[in-house]
Amino acid sequence: HSLGEQVSDLRSFAFTNHLVEVSDTFESLPVEQAVDKVMQAVGGSGTDYGQTLLDIEAQLLEDIDRRTTVLILGDARNNRGQAQAQVMQLLYQRARRVIWLNPEPVSFWGLGDSEMKRYAPYCHIARECNSLAHLESTLDALLRTHSASA
C-alpha cells in the first residue's frame, strides 16, 4: 500500500460482492491487522464484479475524471453474475486510465466464469500480474509514467 506515498488522493477499496472503502484502514493499522479487518468487512462469499461495478457507478463515478487512474487488481471471475461491462465503459470514458492487473494467465481470460474478455476492451492496460515481483515492476512503471506526466 506504499503507492499512497507516491500518489496524492489515493483511495483504496476491497470487495467480494459489495464495495468497501479501506483507505483509512491501511493508513491507520499495520498491514497484517489491516488485511484482517478488510477481510472481515468484505466477507468470504464469491466475488460479484458486476455488483461491485454498480457500486462504483453509484458511489464514485462523479469523483472519476481525466485526472483519475483506476487500478483494479483481480481475476474478473464473476461466479456467473451479470458482468455490468457498461460500467467499465463509463470508467474508460471518464478516467485518465483504467488499468486491470489479473493474476490469471491471459489464456484463462474468458474461460468459465471469467469476464476479463468483456472488461479488457475498456482498459487502457490489461495484463497478467501474478507475483509480487511482477506487481512491483508494473507499479514502478506506472509511477514513472505518473511522475513524467504530473
Feature map (PLM): residue ranges:
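Von Willebrand factor
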Residues: H1-L29, Q33-T68, V70, P105, G110-L111
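Acidic, Ser/Thr-rich peripheral helices and adjacent loops at domain boundaries
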Residues: D24-G43, R118-A126, N130
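Von Willebrand factor type A / integrin I
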Residues: Q89-A150
